[in-house]
Amino acid sequence: RKYKPILIEGPDRRGVDVGFLYDTVMFKPTKVNGFELKAHYADGGVIKTRLQLCVSGYLMGEGKPEKIHVIVNHWPSRYGGELSSRPGRDTAAMLVKSICDSIYLKEPKAKIIIMGDLNDDPFNHSCKDVLKARKYREDVEPQGYFNTMWQMLDRGIGSLAYNGSWNLFDQIIINEPLLSERL
């Protein structure tokens, strides 16, 4: 296999960036955009953090190539506490929603995957209420989102443990057009 990375340097003061690694046989990128995230906090502070990376391209399979959009994220941390840092992650979710809405304007049936370290669980405000990612497939509305990880957390499976309990911050969320597709 031959893999290639896609990376755009962002403004994160620590030099932390997000990237997308793909198999050159299975995926052909056509467009790459980095979206600046300015995390707003309750104290009035604004921090430029990691870009949200949107990679558009074609999945190559047995049939015709399938156009897909992948948004790679690493949302602001919980530094300072979950509640006091929540506005940063809510802002990140709003940016993802805005990116998706822009894609939908051009492609109403676009296929979108949202993935990365969201620093929130599927049931937290940013995922459940801002992005409106649903726990069950049947609850997903047109142009809505399904959180593929939520039910794993219900079974006690997480991606990190903190103070003796599991969290599932690393998530893959897909949109409604992908629910009926077999990729």
Can you say where each PLM-predicted feature lies in the sequence?
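Divalent cation-coordinating acidic motifs and surrounding scaffolds
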Residues: 1-183
